[in-house]
Amino acid sequence: MSHVSNSTDEVVRNYLAAKSMVTSLKAFDQESSFAKEANYQVDRCIDEMTDAIDKHDVDTLCAMWESWNARVFHSLDTEGIKQAQCYEASAYRLFLVRCVQKKNISKCNEFFRKMSSLTLNNPQWADWFAFPYNHHAKDTEPFRKYFDKTWIEIYYVSLHNFLSTSLANVSPSVIGTIVEGIARDPTGNDHVDFDEDLIDDFAVIAQCSAPVKRGHSKPSLRNLLKSLTSSKKPSPSTD
C-alpha cells in the first residue's frame, strides 16, 4: 500500500502547489515526513497512555481509547476487535492499580462513574468494584498479574505491536482507493460520486499536471486522478 500513500501525497502536494499554499505545503511535507519516520507515532501513543495512567488522568485515558477504537480498531475483523477490547480493559485495570498504589481511591470511583457503560452488568468487571478496598489485592486473583512488573512490560510491548499492525491495516482514504484502482486497472469505469467543489479543486491540479479533454459534462474525479498518474508514467520506448 506504500505506493498508494505516495500517490495520494503527490496529489495533495499538487493541490497545495496549484493553490499557491506555500506554508500549508511546507507543513504537509514536514508532517508527512514525521509520520513516516515515527511509524505513525505509536511510541508516542504508548507514552501518552502510560503518562495518563501515572497521572491518574481518567479523561485522557478514556479519550485515547475512544479515538483508537473509532479511527483504528474499527476496521479489524471480529477476532481483532476482541483483542483490542482485551487490551483496553487491561489498560483501565492498570489505571486502577496505579490509583490504589498511590492511595487515590477517589480516582477509582471516578473511573467507575465515567465508564459505567463498560463495567456495569459486565461479568468481567464484577470483581473490580471491590478492588479499591481489597488490602490484599496484590496477592489475590484476578488482580495479581496487574501488579507483576514482568507482565506489565510484556503487555506494553504486545500493545505496541498490536497498535502498529492495526495502523498498517487501516483502510486507505477514498482518494488512495481510487489511485490504487487506477494503477491496477487504468481503463476501468468504476463510478464514484463526489462533491462538485472537490472535483473542481482537483480539476485545477489536473490542468497543471496534464491536458484534460473536456466535454459537455463535468469530468469525474477518477479521470482527473488518472490524468495525474498517467502523466507520471514514462513513455514507451520507440527504439
UniProtKB/Swiss-Prot annotation:
Pfam families from the UniProt entry: CTLH_Armc9 (PF23138)
GO MF term set: phosphatidylinositol 3-kinase inhibitor activity
Subcellular location: Early endosome; Late endosome; Cytoplasm
Entry-linked InterPro entries: ARMC9_CTLH-like_dom, WDR91
UniProt key word Cytoplasm: yes
Disruption phenotype: Coelomocytes contain larger early and late endosomes enriched with PtdIns3P. Delayed conversion of early endosomes to late endosomes with early endosomes retaining PtdInsP3 for a longer duration of time which may possibly be due to a delay in either the turnover or transport of PtdIns3P out of the endosome. This leads to continuous fusion of early endosomes which continues until rab-5 is displaced and rab-7 is recruited. Double knockout with sorf-2 results in a similar phenotype as the individual single sorf-1 knockout.
One GO location term (cellular component): late endosome lumen
Listed GO biological process terms: early endosome to late endosome transport; endosomal transport; negative regulation of phosphatidylinositol 3-kinase/protein kinase B signal transduction; organelle fusion; positive regulation of early endosome to late endosome transport
Disulfide bonds: none
PANTHER family in the cross-refs: WD REPEAT-CONTAINING PROTEIN 91
Family: Belongs to the WD repeat WDR91 family.
SUBUNIT field: Interacts with sorf-2; the interaction is direct. Interacts with bec-1.
UniProt function note: Together with sorf-2 negatively regulates the levels of phosphatidylinositol 3-phosphate (PtdIns3P) to enable the conversion of early endosomes to late endosomes. Binds to sorf-2 and the sorf-1-sorf-2 complex likely acts through bec-1, a non-catalytic subunit of phosphatidylinositol 3-kinase (PI3K), to suppress PI3K activity, thereby negatively regulating endosomal PtdIns3P levels.
Name listed for the protein in its UniProt record: Suppressor of organelle fusion 1
